Amino acid sequence: MTFEDLRQKLKSGEVSSKELVQEKINRINELDPTLNSFLIVNTELALSKAEHIDKQIASGDHLPPLSGIPIAIKDNLCTKGIKTTCASKILDNFVPPYESTVTKKLLNAGAIMIGKTNMDEFAMGSSTETSAFGPTLNPWNITKVPGGSSGGSAASVAAGLCYGSLGSDTGGSIRQPASFCGVVGMKPTYGRVSRWGLIAFASSLDQVGPFANNVSDAAEILQVISGKDELDSTTVDIPVPNYLETLSKSIKGMKIGLIDNCFDHEGLATDVKESVLSSASLLENLGAEIVNISCPRFNDGIATYYVIAPSEASANLARYDGVKYGFRAEDEQSLIEMTSKSRALGFGSEVKRRILIGTYALSAGYVDAYYKKAQQVRTLIRRDFDDAFKKVDVLLAPTAPTTAFGSGDNIDNPMAMYLSDLLTIPANLAGLPAISLPCGFDKSDLPIGLQLIGNVFEEGKLLQVANQFEKAAEVYKNRPKTDFTL
């Protein structure tokens, strides 16, 4: 059921907003003790707002587009008066005194914030296993991970616990879990959506975006949260087009480039490769022209990312010292001891690992050899994309090299975990928009994600291609069983 379907049902009185919210709360109470996709459920607040919206509907008031629709929020987005932990012990009791720009826009659009979703601690991870509050499980198979770091947002949509959600994407943290959980997930162009109120991981890479069950719902959420924000100087003052208007347009004559480097990689699973290539053939049948494109430095993205992102993280996370807010170690004799112990006890092992990597890369003897060189390679990756978009409209690749891997399989193997973001990282380094949508299933009936990458601020074109594929393939209609038998 799309947002438009819900609007019609609410307007006609066939269903009330309170009923929509209560149904999702009941479902959360039934399924989430197993999945652990939510950290906080706003039961009373959500029902109260739903009742208010129902009264407005009964009075015939003109309502904003997402009125009465339950949406979940990743727990690294500040929500005024509602605890925001970033899935970390160090922020366990942090209650923001302000609202992030994107959540404020959603609330102004009438959306009902049903809860805050689980994630990898400080968005550092690819499996939602580094959360201080326990891992999230994949609703398609609870022995598998949902991906990360926005695993709770992806799993909650896939399991039908909400109609849409917000996540953040630094190196694939929306698209990879969207692929693993069989939902639509989109990372906008860097600067399209405000980061004000997003707890920072890597400021030059982080971007907020939507999860949804279908492309049109993702487009609606993106429409609401996009735009210039005076509180975030990295947002760009470019008019936001009407994304819904382009969804139904034909893709006949559009050039779509297959990124050769992705399909040649030895870590790419056969099922994934075959499904994505089959998806390219379907797009060709819809009138698109499929061409091969080489991005020579595409596979250099992962090494580049794991210098730049930890370097930025080491600076951003220096603010958590136990002094002004967050977890504070007790019984320490000096400020230095208190700060050291607060960070040692408050941060998890993956966060500490990345802080150490970043601190090392920025140290006096190594900043030129590592950080400066990584920034130079980042520029070359961006130039490869610039060259590619002179020849094609959209690029096509798998979202992830594999389908969802087993819980615990990679948690003690950082290199294996990092490689799961191999195909998503380059778009972040170049600041490009990219979307993942379900395109098939592997032999174990786990979802496979198709990734489309666009040129800067061409989200509309991406959504157009994605929507035409979705309507033709109809993979999105498959939903996970919810008895959660092993």
Curated annotation (Swiss-Prot):
The active site is at residues 74, 149, 173. It catalyses: L-glutamyl-tRNA(Gln) + L-glutamine + ATP + H2O = L-glutaminyl-tRNA(Gln) + L-glutamate + ADP + phosphate + H(+). One of its GO terms (biological process) is translation. Its EC number is 6.3.5.7. Pfam families: Amidase (PF01425). It is an enzyme of class 6 (ligase). GO terms for molecular function: ATP binding; glutaminyl-tRNA synthase (glutamine-hydrolyzing) activity. Heterotrimer of A, B and C subunits. Belongs to the amidase family. GatA subfamily. Allows the formation of correctly charged Gln-tRNA(Gln) through the transamidation of misacylated Glu-tRNA(Gln) in organisms which lack glutaminyl-tRNA synthetase. The reaction takes place in the presence of glutamine and ATP through an activated gamma-phospho-Glu-tRNA(Gln). NCBIfam families: gatA (TIGR00132). This is Glutamyl-tRNA(Gln) amidotransferase subunit A. It comes from Prochlorococcus marinus (strain NATL1A). The gene is gatA.
